[in-house]
Each structure stands twice: as structure tokens, then as C-alpha cells.
């Protein structure tokens, strides 16, 4: 009787181990088809130091893009945080640019396979755990999508969503 139980336990363990390898094949929906960069900027006509010591100056390229839009024109801009996440073939991804805070979250999901010219995304912006924006975005080339966010410390938050370059240029 004891040997039968031991044999049954061993057989059950073997089936579980073998079954686990059979069923754990790669899910093609989890394949990374690109990368998305989400940045949060602080824009103000006042003193940019109120953004805090961790806020970094933005590049001239980003500043030029921001000043190119009438509603985004401010005297100074600071980068508050950035997150780069993979764009998965069939699953949603979440970016958390102000880590460890979850005050600003961006959910995105691919609508189509990315091309060098553009990529279609389902995009949601969440502030303070509330969805405030849902849109179909078409991101192209080096042109980010800017979203004018809420007022903050005498200025405004600007959320930027853009395609990020691949980690390995050859892949």
C-alpha cells in the first residue's frame, strides 16, 4: 500500500513537471514589437526651482517642440520623470514615469504593427488613479504626442508619449 502511494506521488510529480514545460511555451502576444517612452515635464512662467531639486533641464530639441505648440508655451521647462516600457504585440503595457508614485500612469496597447513611419496605439492617461483621457494615438518618427496636464505648483504638467529607439540597433 505504501509503495503504491509513493509511486502515485512520483507519477503525479512527473506529470506536473512535464506538463509545465509543455504548457509554458512562448506566448506570441507577449512579443515586444517596439518601445514607448513616457515623460512628464513641468512647465511654468514663474520660478522653475519650485519643481524640486530632482527636476532636470530639458534638451533644446524638446524645448523647441514644446514652444512650437501655442498652448504649451511657457518660459521654462523641467523634466520630472521618464519611463520606457516595451510595446507588446497583444497585451497592454503601463508606464509609470514618476516612480515610485502612481499619480501619473499611462496605459498603452498596440493597434497595429509598428512601421518606421508610424504606430497606432490605444492610449489612456490616468491621474490619481482616475482615467482622464482615452484616445487612439498615432505616433510617428521622432514626433512625440504632448498632453497638457493639470496645474501643479504654479505651472502645468505636460505628459509626452513617444516611440523609443530599440535597445539593440540590430534587432
What are these regions (language model features)?
Residues 2, 25-171:
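Outer membrane pore-forming secretion/assembly proteins and partners of Gram-negative envelopes
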Residues 3-9:
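N-terminal export leaders
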Residues 11-12, 22:
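Cleavable N-terminal signal peptides
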Amino acid at each position: 500500500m505504501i509503495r503504491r502511494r509513493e509511486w502515485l506521488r512520483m507519477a503525479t510529480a512527473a506529470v506536473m513537471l512535464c506538463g509545465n514545460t509543455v504548457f509554458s511555451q512562448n506566448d506570441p502576444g507577449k512579443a515586444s514589437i517596439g518601445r514607448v517612452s513616457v515623460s512628464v515635464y513641468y512647465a511654468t512662467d514663474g520660478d522653475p526651482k519650485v519643481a524640486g531639486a530632482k527636476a532636470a533641464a530639458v534638451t533644446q530639441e524638446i524645448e523647441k517642440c514644446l514652444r512650437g505648440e501655442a498652448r504649451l508655451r511657457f518660459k521654462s521647462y523641467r523634466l520630472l520623470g521618464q519611463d520606457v516600457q516595451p510595446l507588446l504585440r497583444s497585451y497592454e503595457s503601463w508606464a509609470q514615469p514618476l516612480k515610485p508614485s502612481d499619480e501619473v500612469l499611462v496605459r498603452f496597447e498596440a493597434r497595429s504593427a509598428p512601421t518606421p513611419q508610424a504606430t497606432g496605439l490605444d492610449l489612456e492617461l490616468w491621474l490619481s488613479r482616475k482615467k482622464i483621457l482615452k484616445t487612439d494615438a498615432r505616433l510617428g518618427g521622432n514626433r512625440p504626442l504632448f498632453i497638457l496636464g493639470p496645474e501643479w505648483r504654479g505651472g502645468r504638467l505636460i505628459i509626452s508619449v513617444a516611440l523609443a529607439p530599440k535597445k539593440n540597433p540590430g534587432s
